[in-house]
Structure formats: C-alpha cells, structure tokens
C-alpha cells in the first residue's frame, strides 16, 4: 500500500475494472429479490452540472447499498434527447441538432463514468433514436384505435413576422425571441390524449403512494382538482339558445346578479360584431395568453355584451358580460357571478357598478359585505324556498329542483385538462398520423413504423425542416396520396415511459417484454427534482396506467418510492452596466472580504471591478454561478465530490456549495487512508478473541457496532445520508484516540476498518474498494455483504451512573449493567462526595433511572 492517497490513480483503476467486467450489468433472476433504482435521466445539454451530480450520487449510493443487502439491483441510464435547446444550439452553431446531441451524450457519458456511477450501460437508450420512438408512435396509434386520442383547435403563440409557432420559452416580454414582433394567440388543430378519462384513478391511487413526499402528492391532488358541484343551464333572453355554467356553490344561486363569459365565447363573438368596444376588448384578450396564477393577480376587466340571461330558478333577467378572467379552455367558458359571495365577482361588480345581492349569512353573527365578499359557507336567506338551509341541504335542494325542471344536474369536475401533445417543432418524435385527400385522418399503418425524423437537416430558426420540405410529408395510404403529420410530440411523451423501456431496451419486436417488465417494475426508488412533481410524474403515472390497460405491465403505479433532492446553491456576484443591466461574474473570478462570521463585506473581480454580492442562489447559466463538476473531479477526485454531495446537507434539502467543505471531504479520505496505512505498516493482524477483551476494548467494539446499526438505519430506512457519514466520522475520531498497543487492539481496528470501508463503499466506492483489497480481502467489495451488527457487542457488562444530590452532580459510578436501585443506592451512599452532602439530612425522595441516573433529594 502506498503511503499517500492518490484518488486519480485509484479511481481510474476501479472504473476500468468495472467497465471491463460489466460489474453493474443486471439480468432477471427470479430467485433473488429485485431492486430497481432510477434517477431521472438528463437532457444532453453539453456537460453535467452539479444538480445532475447530486441527483446521480444519491441514486448510486442507494443502488450500491441495496446490492450489498444481497438484492438484484438494476440502475440504468439514458438520455432525454429531444427538445428545443438542441434546435436553438443548432441554429447558433449552424449545425444539425442530431450531431450536437450525440456529441453531448458522448461527453456526458464520460463524465458519469468518471464519477464512478454503477450504471448498466448495456441498457442505455436515447429518446431521439428510431428504435426508441418507434414504439411511442406504435402506442399512440393504439390509443387512437381505443378512442383515447382526438384533434381539436387549440391556442398557440404565433410570431406573425417569422410565420411560426413559438414555445412559451421563446416569448420574451410578449415578443418573439428572434423577430421581436408582438406575439399573437392563434388557434390551430392539435392532438390531445384523454388523460381526463383517468383523472379519478390518478387521484385515488395517490393514496397508494405512501412512500412519496406528501408535498408532491398534495401538488398532484391540487392539479387534478376534483370538485363536486352542479351544472345548470341559463337561457339567453330573446333567443332559442342556452349555455351551461358549473358551480361548486349552488347554495348561492339566488345571489347571481350577472353572468361572465370568455372573450372567445360564441355569445361574446356574436355581440362583438355590432359593438366596436367589445370587439377591441375580445381582440385584446385573445392576444394575451394567461396562466391561472396570472389571472388571479391581474386587473379584472370586462365589457357588457348587451345580452341578458334568464335565471334558471327565479326567471329574472341578469346581464351577460365578457370578462378577461374567464377562459374558454376551462369548463364551458361561462361562469355565474355572485358578487356578494365571491371576491373576484365582488371586485368586478364594484368596478362596473353591478348589483350585489347577499344570500348567505353566518349562522351566529351579522353579515358585513361593505368592504369584501362573504365567501364562507353559512345559511341561506333572501333565497325564497331555500331560506334557512345550510350549505349541504341547499346544495341538495337546488340540485333536486334543477333536475326536476330539466335545467341542471349534479356533476363531478376536474381541473385537469386533456394532454395536448402536438408541438410545431422539428427536434421531436413525428406524430404517426396521415392526412388523406378526403379530409380524413388515419394512423400510420404498423408495418410503416417508425416514421423517421430526418437528422441531416439545415436549421434556419424560422420553420421546422420537416414542415419546410413538402417531399418529406408526401406518402401514400392504400394506394391513395396522403401526407404525414408534420407536428412532433411534446417531449414529455418520451420521458413518460422510458423507465419501462429500460427493462427490455433491446426488444425490437415489442414496446416492452412483459416478462422482463413485470420482473423489474415498479421502480423501487425514483430520484429527481421537485420541479417535476406535477407534469412529468403525472404524465408518467398516466402512461403507466395506459400500458397496464394494454396488458404490457401488471402493476398500477410506475414508482414505488420517490426522493426529491434539493437544489444546489452557490454564491452569485454581479455589477451593473451602463444601461443598468446586471452582468453576472463567476465566483471563481471574484475576491471577497468577509467579517468574523464569514459574511461578505466587499467583493471585487481580480482586475479590481467592484461587484455586488447577491447571496446564495440556484446554480444557473443565467447567474454564471455554476461550478464545473469536471474541474472538481480533476482537483479533488470523484470520491471527495461524492462525499461532499452526500454530507453537506440532507438529500431532500438545498445544498450550499463550498470549496472549503469539499477540501474537508478530501482531508477526511486522506485521514482514513493514513489510519489504514499506519495499521498495515505494523504487519499481520491476529484474529479477534472476544473473551480476552478489556473494558476499553469492549467499549470500542460497542461503538463500532452501534455505528453499523445507525448507518444501516440512516441509509436504508431514513435516507439521512449526511447523518450516516457523521456517525462514521465520530467512530474514526474514537479510533484515532485509542492506542493500538496490543494484538487485540489491532484486531479490533482491523474489524473497524473493514466495517468502515463497507459502510462508506456506496458513498466513496473507489477508495473503499482499494482499502478493502489492501486490508486482505479477496472478494470484491461490490459483492461483499453489508456489515452486520454483533448484538452481543452491544450488551454492556457495566454502566456509568450519574449520582446527583438535589440535582447537582456529586459522583459518577461504574456499576453492573443490571444493577437494581438498592445496589446503586448502597454504593452511592458509601461514596465520600455523596455522603458529604447527605449526612445529617433527611432523604425525602430518590429518583432512579436504570443505567443512567440516581438523584437524591435531601434537606
């Protein structure tokens, strides 16, 4: 064993060894308990960032730990390779997205290997490869056959200068990112998958996911947004037509004083023909794409359509207004407005001087709606036949009346909308549909799949190459001319089923091999960022249920246990340019002055430019505060980087980057190396002889086995990896303070070092593999079993008892571990320092905590 720890040399040795031996190749073995550990696959953007490193280190630690538990572990890796950034990079670098993507994959794969991650590379997949996306296309055609897919008009961002559809990210302050033109909202036909058909099951099955963070389950529940209410019909005065509204508060129906419709509602569009003010308002609303969150905070505006609606119960007329807070895509595009009992309706009514009629009051206090709406549930009044009814009774009574008069019904609604999967981009999976000359649309026949995306293309940044090339779209169907759909799939499609494809990635005659899929699925542990809590995880759960219903998998859910790792933060610095814009400077180019508490007082670039410290924020390109993992691996070694990632913070919380803490990780590993070197330098080690051990030796072994028990629980059950590492550090401190004079001292140290290498092996695998070897072990640490706790070592022959008199420490006694109160009391009373404070006094009370404390109360 060499004296100095050389991470580069050791890491290269074992990475080569693992690669050549395919040490992490997984095969189905029904005789062993399987464990499928998966980290969310990366987008191949160019190089790994520290968020990736944290995510993948956590996954690798769990995988290696489970392998040492004797399980058959699969940990695959692949590439979420389609998407807009590749198009943007291709335009910028005047290249095709495919080449850029494959180059990035090659580089990032090298980085992953340098970090020692134990992936089964034989299962590697990239979603941009036809052998992957052909099955996505095939499955989509099956969904079409089952009537789970439809096409309808939907709104997109349209750049009128570039004549192209823009992704939300390409709209900057309402303008196209390239042309600078004001972006319009345009309706075009798009494909949708009926996720709403599974809304109830997606909601119900969240209860099965008891190993998911409650925060994620709550976010999904809210996104699905189940509500129970009443749908009722309002007739339009003087017309044959009627329209429906949905409400969760039918108890307030007698307080409706106006109805609000979306700017794109047929009634609004009809009224706008003869009303220039309304027409201008509708146009303004059309060109503003709003999320629900923005609607909640924006100024409420509207225009009277001039139409009146007939109240379904009172028969009274109420005005119909067009309002900017009603969206055509939600419900019927019309809402009943009860300003006395809804704050948004209240603000609108106040602004436009509309009637406010109160119909609900608190049970035991006076009603006051002078400054805001009363939105709580209460008792009906001024509501005719519903007076005196509470919420529940009024709900039922209103529903019963509407149903009897054929004007409404009870209904369950979901906030969840069907999944729009069309994208007007190039770098994605072509949607496998054909347009025929008679206007009909049919799926591409199975024997013509995949519809291959051409990779050798020129990107002009304006229009998708497959939309620009009429020859690409031309094809035939049953001998008739046809054209291919030129839209591509939302990239969430690829990431919705990749976890299942890993089970049989080479399968070329089926989407999944059911036998293999049912052996490995569900994923036992999934790791990824909280930002994917809703869309990716919800779409993936939906896709899994589709796979199940097509007989491809047996289980109901894709991911059994979920860990959402925290972000990686770093210091951020900037100065303001002449226009007041922020110019962000990399922390490595900044020199700082700090106070005694480490707080930054002043900062400047190395050439003297004063900069402002912006605190810690998420590592990002925009703030130029990312740390290149490659630089850290080269400087400190992969094991030090991995150790820092697992020790600096609990896995599910934010991690603050610190170069000095990373140096501390390297120091710790050097210390472990030195303890092993000094130990081995003394020559051969005797076997443990438990019977001959002194109290001090028994105590040290007890500490060792307590540590094994704690680390096992911390990693295996609690997933508090940082406290597991802290326990090993404490044990090492005790080992270094213990003299190794005798044969048995060294035998215990040998046992401890072997245990420590195993305990740390999932976290710092390279150094532990080397130490395990030099400590005389013939098997590879990869295949070594996790250390077991020697229960007999935990049994204490004696205990240290604290003796207090009137709450003050007077003695510490070593007594037999099973000593009863009488024995401990007798020994304590003979102690000189105890008797000094009890002689001549009356003992009023004795408090005894077995094995810990004796407190004598005397006066």
Curated annotation (Swiss-Prot):
Family annotation (Gene3D superfamilies): 2.20.28.290, 3.10.20.590, HUPs, Isoleucyl-tRNA Synthetase, Domain 1
Top EC class of this enzyme: ligase
BP terms from Gene Ontology: leucyl-tRNA aminoacylation
Subcellular locations according to the entry: Cytoplasm
Motif 'KMSKS' region boundaries: 618-622
MF GO annotations: aminoacyl-tRNA deacylase activity; ATP binding; leucine-tRNA ligase activity
Alphabetic keyword roster: Aminoacyl-tRNA synthetase, ATP-binding, Cytoplasm, Ligase, Nucleotide-binding, Protein biosynthesis
Motif annotated as 'HIGH' region, chain positions: 42-52
EC number: 6.1.1.4
PROSITE patterns: AA_TRNA_LIGASE_I (PS00178)
Binding locations of ATP: 621
Highest taxon of the lineage: Bacteria
Keyword match DNA-binding: no
Catalysed transformations (reactions): tRNA(Leu) + L-leucine + ATP = L-leucyl-tRNA(Leu) + AMP + diphosphate
GO cellular component terms listed in the entry, alphabetical order: cytosol
Principal location: cytoplasm
Similarity-based family: Belongs to the class-I aminoacyl-tRNA synthetase family.
Protein name: Leucine--tRNA ligase
Gene name tied to this protein: leuS
């Amino acid at each position: 064993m060499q004296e100095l720890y050389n991470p580069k040399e050791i890491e290269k040795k074992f990475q080569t060894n693992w690669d050549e031996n395919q040490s992490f190749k997984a095969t189905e073995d029904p005789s062993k308990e399987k464990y499928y550990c998966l980290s969310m696959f990366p987008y191949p953007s160019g190089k790994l960032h520290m968020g990736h490193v944290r995510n993948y280190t956590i996954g690798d630690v769990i995988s290696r730990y489970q392998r040492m538990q004797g399980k058959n572990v699969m940990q695959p890796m692949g590439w979420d390779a389609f998407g807009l950034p590749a198009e943007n990079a291709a335009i910028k670098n005047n290249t095709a997205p495919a080449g850029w993507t494959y180059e990035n994959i090659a580089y990032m794969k090298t980085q992953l290997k340098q970090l020692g991650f134990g992936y089964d590379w034989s299962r590697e997949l990239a979603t941009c490869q036809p052998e992957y996306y052909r099955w996505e296309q095939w499955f989509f055609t099956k969904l079409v056959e089952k009537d789970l897919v439809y096409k309808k008009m939907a709104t997109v961002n349209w750049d009128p200068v570039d004549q192209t559809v823009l992704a939300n990210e390409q709209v900057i302050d309402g303008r196209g990112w390239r042309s600078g033109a004001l972006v319009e909202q345009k309706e075009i036909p798009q494909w949708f998958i009926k996720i709403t058909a599974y809304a109830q099951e997606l909601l119900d099955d969240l209860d099965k996911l008891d190993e998911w963070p409650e925060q994620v389950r709550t976010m999904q529940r809210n996104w699905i947004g189940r509500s129970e209410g009443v749908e009722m019909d309002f007739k339009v005065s003087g017309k044959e037509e009627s329209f429906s509204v949905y409400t969760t508060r039918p108890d307030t129906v007698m307080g409706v004083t106006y109805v609000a419709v979306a700017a794109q509602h047929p009634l609004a569009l009809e009224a706008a023909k003869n009303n220039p003010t309304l027409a201008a308002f509708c146009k303004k609303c059309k060109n503003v794409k709003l999320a629900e969150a923005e609607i909640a905070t924006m100024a409420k505006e509207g225009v009277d359509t001039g139409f009146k609606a007939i109240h379904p119960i009172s028969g009274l007329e109420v005005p119909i207004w067009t309002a900017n807070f009603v969206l055509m895509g939600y419900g019927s595009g019309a809402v009943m407005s009860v300003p006395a009992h809804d704050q948004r309706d209240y603000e609108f009514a106040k602004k436009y001087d509309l009637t406010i009629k109160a119909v609900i009051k608190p049970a035991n206090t006076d009603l006051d709606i002078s400054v805001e709406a009363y939105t709580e549930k209460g008792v009906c009044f001024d509501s005719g036949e519903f007076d005196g009814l509470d919420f529940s009774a009024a709900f039922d009574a209103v529903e019963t009346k509407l149903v009897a008069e054929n004007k409404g019904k009870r209904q369950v609604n979901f906030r969840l909308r069907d999944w729009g999967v069309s994208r007007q981009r190039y770098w994605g999976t072509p949607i496998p549909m054909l347009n025929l000359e008679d206007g009909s649309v049919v799926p591409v026949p199975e024997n013509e799949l995949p519809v291959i995306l051409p990779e050798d293309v020129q990107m002009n940044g304006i229009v998708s190459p497959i939309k620009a090339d009429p020859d690409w779209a031309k094809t035939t169907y049953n001998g008739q001319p046809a054209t291919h759909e030129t839209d591509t799939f939302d990239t969430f499609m690829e990431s919705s089923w990749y976890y299942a494809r890993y089970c049989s990635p080479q399968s070329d005659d089926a989407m999944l091999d059911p036998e293999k899929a049912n052996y490995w699925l569900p994923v036992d542990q999934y790791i990824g960022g909280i930002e994917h809590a809703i869309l990716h995880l919800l779409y993936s759960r939906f896709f899994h249920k589709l796979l199940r219903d097509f007989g491809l998998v047996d289980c109901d859910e894709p991911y059994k246990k979920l860990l959402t790792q925290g972000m990686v933060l770093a210091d951020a610095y900037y100065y303001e340019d002449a226009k007041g814009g922020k110019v962000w400077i990399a922390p490595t180019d900044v020199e700082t002055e700090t106070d005694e508490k480490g707080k930054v007082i002043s900062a400047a670039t190395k050439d003297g430019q004063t900069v402002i410290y912006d605190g810690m924020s998420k590592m990002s390109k925009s703030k130029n505060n990312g740390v290149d993992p490659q630089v850290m691996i080269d400087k400190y070694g992969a094991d030090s980087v991995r150790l820092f990632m697992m020790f600096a913070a609990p896995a599910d919380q934010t991690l603050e980057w610190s170069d000095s803490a990373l140096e501390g990780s390297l120091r710790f590993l050097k210390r472990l190396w030195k303890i092993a070197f000094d130990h081995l330098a003394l020559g051969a080690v005797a076997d443990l002889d438990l019977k001959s051990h002194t109290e001090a030796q028994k105590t040290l072994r007890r500490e060792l086995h307590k540590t094994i028990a704690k680390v096992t629980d911390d990693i295996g059950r609690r997933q508090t990896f940082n406290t597991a590492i802290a326990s090993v550090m404490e044990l090492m401190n005790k080992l270094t303070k213990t003299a190794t004079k005798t044969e048995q001292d060294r035998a215990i140290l040998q046992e401890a070092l072997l245990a420590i290498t195993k305990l740390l092996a999932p976290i710092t695998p390279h150094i532990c593999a080397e130490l395990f070897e030099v400590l005389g072990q013939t098997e590879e640490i990869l295949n070594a079993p996790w250390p077991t706790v020697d229960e007999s070592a935990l049994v204490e022959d004696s205990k240290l008892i604290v003796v207090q008199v009137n709450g003050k420490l007077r003695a510490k006694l070593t007594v037999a571990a099973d000593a009863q109160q009488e024995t401990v009391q007798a020994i304590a009373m003979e102690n000189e320092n105890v008797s000094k404070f009890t002689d001549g006094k009356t003992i009023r009370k004795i408090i005894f905590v077995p094995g810990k404390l004796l407190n004598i109360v005397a006066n």
